[in-house]
């Protein structure tokens, strides 16, 4: 979160929640409605939320409470009292079946198991990570402790490992911006078929829809400079006669990026129904028609991709934080 500094004010202490903002109106926002002018500054809040703050007297223009429609002028001072988020106090009596890797008043990071969706959508309306977190943090009868969880990033349902979730609106905005600006270091581990030609390398290939596929959501690679740019760094950790354990660090965050890139270099992920040897396995799986031969070909009942680490700047701690998830036992079994 980057706010314009009011003349004469020192740098803000990021280790504390933001309690008040003062804005000096300049030529860029002059003539706008008050709510629109504030929306350009309080970017983590919706316009309707800002309008409510104005109507509740939490915003003052030149020291006076005015309606959201009031036009602002060059040199006006806007003062905003920022409502504080509820305090995160986990319900210790609630069942929580996901391993916790890190937790503080601003966030929680968990080791998501494979097969769990991160949020409700489509066919997955129950049993998601968000449902689990609601049991731990939501307290509708105690507004001061009723915390809304906000995902900082997402991983596929079949992918296991680190998922970070914000428990504070300001914190979520600050860290989410790091993801958008590609400042977060994301590490993955995958078990792939075979062994890459080079033990270490970079896959720099754009990603586009695979028009030759019967599966609408399937993607494929193209030459650099076309499609969505995508870059993945990889390093072979160890190999046996069938598989390789590969460490991956994507520089971009495209849909299915690691799976597409590993398939493109001839080493698809173990268990990958869509980007493995036969996409018919994906269609059979969707239809519930996957037979024993298909399951044997896949080796695993999910694709072998694991979100192993996440490093980002924690604005309240004032330092980088690294969160790690241990190697899944099924990966270790494949590499034994």
Where are each of the predicted segments found?
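RNA pseudouridine synthases
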Residues: 1-336
């Amino acid at each position: 979160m980057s706010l314009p500094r009011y003349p004469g004010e020192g740098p803000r202490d990021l280790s504390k929640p933001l309690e008040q903002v003062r804005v000096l109106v300049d030529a860029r926002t002059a003539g706008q409605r008050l709510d629109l002018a504030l929306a350009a500054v309080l970017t983590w809040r919706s316009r309707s939320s800002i309008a409510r703050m104005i109507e509740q007297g939490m915003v003052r223009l030149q020291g006076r409470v005015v309606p959201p429609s009031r036009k602002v002028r060059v040199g006006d001072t806007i003062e905003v009292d920022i409502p504080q988020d509820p305090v995160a106090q986990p319900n210790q009596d609630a069942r929580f079946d996901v391993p916790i890797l890190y937790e503080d008043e601003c966030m929680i990071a968990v080791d998501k198991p494979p097969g769990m969706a991160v949020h409700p959508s489509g066919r997955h309306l129950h049993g998601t990570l968000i449902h689990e977190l609601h049991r731990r943090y939501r307290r509708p009868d105690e507004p001061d402790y009723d915390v809304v969880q906000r995902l900082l990033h997402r991983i596929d349902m079949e992918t296991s490992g680190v998922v970070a979730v914000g428990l504070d609106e300001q914190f979520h905005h600050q860290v989410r911006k790091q993801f958008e600006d590609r400042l977060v270091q994301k590490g993955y581990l995958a078990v792939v078929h075979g062994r890459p030609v080079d033990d270490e390398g970079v896959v720099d290939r754009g990603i586009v829809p695979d028009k030759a596929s019967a599966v609408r959501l399937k993607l494929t690679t193209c030459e650099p400079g076309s499609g969505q740019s995508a870059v993945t760094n990889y390093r072979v950790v160890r190999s046996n006669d069938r598989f390789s354990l590969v460490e991956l660090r994507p520089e971009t965050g495209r849909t299915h990026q690691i799976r597409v890139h590993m398939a493109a270099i001839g080493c698809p992920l173990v268990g990958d129904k869509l980007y493995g040897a036969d996409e018919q396995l994906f269609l059979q799986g969707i239809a519930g028609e996957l037979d024993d031969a298909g399951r044997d070909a896949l080796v695993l009942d999910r694709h072998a991709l694991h979100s192993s680490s996440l490093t980002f700047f924690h604005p309240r701690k004032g330092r980088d934080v690294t969160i790690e998830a241990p190697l899944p036992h099924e990966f270790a079994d494949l590499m034994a």
